[in-house]
Amino acid sequence: MCKDSACFSTMKETDLEAVATAVQRVAGMLQRPDQLDKVEQYRRREARKKASVEARLKAAIQSQLDGVRTGLSQLHNALNDVKDIQQSLADVSKDWRQSINTIESLKDVKDAVVQHSQLAAAVENLKNIFSVPEIVRETQDLIEQGALLQAHRKLMDLECSRDGLMCEQYRMDSGNKRDMTLIHGYFGSTQGLSDELAKQLWMVLQRSLVTVRRDPTLLVSVVRIIEREEKIDRRILDRKKQTGFVPPGRPKNWKEKMFAVLDRTVTTRIEGTQADTRESDKMWLVRHLEIIRKYVLDDLVIAKNLLVQCFPPHYDIFKNLLSMYHQALSIRMQDLASEDLEANEIVSLLTWVLNTYTSAEMMGNVELAPEVDVNALEPLLSPNVVSELLDTYMSTLTSNIIAWLRKALETDKKDWSKETEPEADQDGYYQTTLPAIVFQMFEQNLQVAAQISEDLKTKVLVLCLQQMNSFLSRYKEEAQLYKEEHLRNRQHPHCYVQYMVAIINNCQTFKESIISLKRKYLKPETEESLCQSQPSMDGILDAIAKEGCSSLLEEVFLDLEQHLNELMTKKWMLGSNAVDIICVTVEDYFNDFAKIKKPYKKRMTAEAHRRVVVEYLRAVMQKRISFRSAEERKEGAEKMVREAEQLRFLFRKLASGFGEDADGHCDTIVAVAEVIKLTDPSLLYLEVSTLVSKYPDIRDDHIGALLALRGDASRDMKQTIMETLEQGPMQASPNYVPIFQEIVVPSLNVAKLLK
């Protein structure tokens, strides 16, 4: 009653909901007055929709009813079938109970049947019993002739007679050992024939990969014999469950022995491939591994294409042979890994084990697909053994790289003392063979490591970069010693400048080679992490190049020293050509420096420009002369301006192509000349202030020396200028490059300034 009430309530709610929805739809249709004309049209349309929905609903309900009707019919049929089966089982049970007594009453008949079968077996074997010696001779002859199938047939007859007699004797009187021994002794030659036949079978199986190509019929005969023996073994084991009797020599398990023979053959074949030793041939391991690769591939291809046709499918001969070869190879690789291998031998072994073995050259060969799945093969060497080999290799490689780098540097050092200039690259830049030798060595080791694994390749690259760091430190020391040796005797080495240029250029080559090496052998993400963990070699290389450039400039300024000392002297005032000689000397040296690669040549040109100007200003501050008149000051200042322009022209020429302004340093000479040239002493403070604002690193002793050079500043004027400048020190701009700070004014000049 409650269910009916709930159902009625639900239907009522549904009706109300439908009415509300209909009202809402009608209200939506009749929102404007002109839509009243279409009321009939709307009514017909809704009627059609209603009829369509009702038709679909009826069809769905009818389909559900048909399904229910079919299900009920099938359940009814199943119930009838269950009743029939139940009745049949009851009938069978009744018949079985009625037959128990009948079976027990036939016991005497059963005993008679057993006795009859024993007598029948004796009669059947009488002929064989009397012909045993003759059959033994025939079987022996057939074995010697290689007629294995016929020999086995004879052997089976002998064994069948012996086993039949012994079985019947066992069933009649299992405790009678004398009769059993008598039968066994009479057939004593049978076991010997079986062993002799087995030897012949094993000999054929040992040469199965050769036999299958020359005489596959013989191999098939061997397999048939083994299969016959397996069937006899199974039959005897089944009979043992009933009688408890097992004939002597059974089970033979020739199938199991066959696989053992094949396993020993595979092991012997793998071990016998080593023809050389390290003493007789340095490439012994490579040859050994290549022979193994060729033999194993050839054997497995033959096994896949020919051998499987000679064996029953359930022998799964190819899969078993593959497992044997894999196991034999694993043992052989472990034996090799345990030897005291050299670095190149470790590489050969690991490359073969980790790559060659699963490659298309061996197990991944198309001729072995799809039977061989390289992804399913177990590793030939355990991860621990591989790790130990890699550790040994890395240790040996570290020692080798250190020795190679040391030898390369020693060879390069010998070249530095040659009387001939170093070689030039395709662009005409001097270079030595050191970078090429070093990175060729790195490249070779990285290529070898890449054959083994990505991880080893990365480790070797890290090792190379680490050793490169140490090597560059030694390279820097040797370059410094080379410079010091030259300074002790500037006539030696003869090509010092050219080889120092080559050393500088080598730094750029090293940089480029390191970048190339990383790009070639590192993935981007690995390179980023390596750069964070490894110190940058750019700093070391730049330091070597900078010291090299400084050494060359030192060479230049040693030749310029005499002429720089002539500046701002009486000789200079009288028309010395010191600046001309300076320009010619610098340009001549820079003709050799043209063989320096651009990044370093650019820095060197800028440094030479700066140092020439500094030395010129140093001469100004040395108070080598003191102008006595305005005319002398004007003449000296104009000469300074001309020489500044001369230097400007020179360094513009040397810096052409660098894209930088080379005028800034020479402007300093012009600015100092303007202070000297000034004719009105009252404006001297203003001019000096302007100079100090441009060059904030100028000190009071510089100003004092400059005023002393003018020769017309009174003591009070000097004091006033100095005190005023000290009250408001100038702040240097961030981009200002100091030029006065390294110019030291002799203390004598400062003392005279205050007099």
From Swiss-Prot:
Q: Does the keyword Acetylation apply?
A: yes
Similarity section: Belongs to the SEC6 family.
Q: What does this protein do?
A: Component of the exocyst complex involved in the docking of exocytic vesicles with fusion sites on the plasma membrane.
Q: Name one GO biological process term.
A: exocytosis
| This protein's UniProt keywords | Acetylation, Cell projection, Coiled coil, Cytoplasm, Exocytosis, Golgi apparatus, Protein transport, Transport
GO terms under cellular component: exocyst; Golgi apparatus; growth cone; midbody; perinuclear region of cytoplasm; presynaptic membrane
The cellular location(s) given in this protein's UniProt record come to: Cytoplasm; Cytoplasm, Perinuclear region; Cell projection, Growth cone; Cell projection, Neuron projection
Residues forming coiled coils: 34-62, 618-649
The protein's organism comes out as Rattus norvegicus
The organism's taxonomic lineage, starting at the top: Eukaryota, Metazoa, Chordata, Craniata, Vertebrata
Q: How does it assemble?
A: The exocyst complex is composed of EXOC1, EXOC2, EXOC3, EXOC4, EXOC5, EXOC6, EXOC7 and EXOC8. Interacts with EXOC3L1. Interacts with BIRC6/bruce. Interacts with MYRIP. Interacts with SLC6A9.
* Free-text tissue specificity from the UniProt record: Widely expressed, with highest levels in kidney, followed by brain (at protein level).
Q: What is this protein called?
A: Exocyst complex component 3
Q: Which residues carry this modification: N6-acetyllysine?
A: 38
Q: Which GO terms describe its molecular function?
A: SNARE binding
